[in-house]
Amino acid sequence: MNHAEEVAKFAAILEQKGLLSGIEGNVSVIDRETGHIFITPSRRMKLLLTPEDICVVDANGEQVGGTGRRSSEFFLHEAIYRARPDVRAVVHSHSPYLTAYALRYEDLVVPETASIRGFFPRMVCLPFGQPGTHEIHRGIENALAQCPVCLLGGHGAVSVSGTLEDAAALLCAAENTAKALWVARMMG
């Protein structure tokens, strides 16, 4: 499977699971040899994307492939790839429960008894940064050094990994954890 196929496939899976919604959220991978970033296009339903739709952006930030306009959150993905040479995949989501914590500007602290705690004991919530600008990734390097998932204050969440499958799986696990913690909070 090539990079564009991989991005289209996982974007569709994440939309089917309710972690990406309609035109919200974006998925990317980087080819570390060429520096090309393959990212979902802006304002497109992820379920309908084909590999030909996936935007390809070169190391100079120029779009060299794909249909439509690259995601407005390209700068977020680019900053993560620059800061973390070990990362090859980024998922940015507005999933309901992680976003609820982000809207409260609240770190998500996983209880010691939760089995998932080994993956992320604390998901840091960054201060608000204007979406689509360089502000949105302020502090992300430190947050992602602590945990492969972090919250973007007032906005959503990001997961990173060496593979897109793993970044997607981490986001799924983080959303389920956020949901369980939210329900437990509501139960008192």
Language-model region placement:
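Glycine-rich flexible loops
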Residues: 1-188
